[in-house]
Amino acid sequence: MSPPKGNLKARGPRADPVPVTVFSAPELLNVAEAEGMIFPPHVVDQLVAALDAGKHVILTGPPGTGKTTLAYLAAELGRHSMLCTGYQPTTATSEWTTFETIGGLQPTPEGLIFRPGLFVEAIETGKWLVIDELNRSNFDRAFGQLFTVLSGSAVVLPFRRSGQIKPISLVPHGVEAPADTDPIRLPASWRIIATMNALDKHLLFDMSYALMRRFAFIEVTTPPDWAYEKLLEGDGEIVQKLLPLRTLNNLGPAIFVDAKRYVHRRQRDDVTQSRLLYEIFYAFFLPQFEGIDEHKAVQLYKLVAKHLDPPEQAETQRVVAELLGEELVG
């Protein structure tokens, strides 16, 4: 995994080795803590158990709980446990079709050739597939024949690989390939780990029951208060002043960790504590309160303003009022 710098959701695979050989919950917890993240042990236990049991997994929970980071770390641990060759990160979109996921014909100077999609490419290379924001896809349109494959049956695709005369088939481990096909076999340990914001379940498209049955759902809950305090030791001391905001919204630790990293960099500059606190509030926390009512807006302002000097208090009152869409009273 990348070092704990930068945006958590932007991380991808890295090549340098991690001294881990056992795919277990204790190992995953240790790797997570080394990355500056603390997850409830029962969440990690569930994730490891589900993957060990042969299930694909969807991690759900509030924004900022570190779902994407946990997915990456689990896949990276899988790589160093020889369960996969690596992992392929992607973000789902509403435009996904089977062309993006399974593949399709692509024109070339030599004619039309089959271009594998994300899923087929991951299967062929032995990589686990990590999908962020899965709920943003149209599941039935995007998964297509994968429904059959994920349920343990082989499926024949209407495509042929370059130089082949037989159609491609996707064949789960332990299943006989259909006759007269060019099989692409799913490794026994191949997995999909996807994330879904609990608050976004109603957005764009509803997940069909057919797809839900093919995944284990695991809720990534927020850790206890002591975990936040531990994560914010050192440079994060100023960020601890914003921990009471959790009484207004179930803010995950990743938001606070990102704020701590910003503080670490910004403290090199000539900036007052009041200004710095306002900056991290505006940059990392204010967007999490979109859609709050007037009562919560007043509480939000008061919780932050008591730590600020008059100039930053005025700015905070203004931006909270803009978020509310009307003048802040109280």
Where are these regions (language model features)?
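C-terminal regulatory/interaction module of P-loop NTP-utilizing enzymes
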Residues: M1-G330
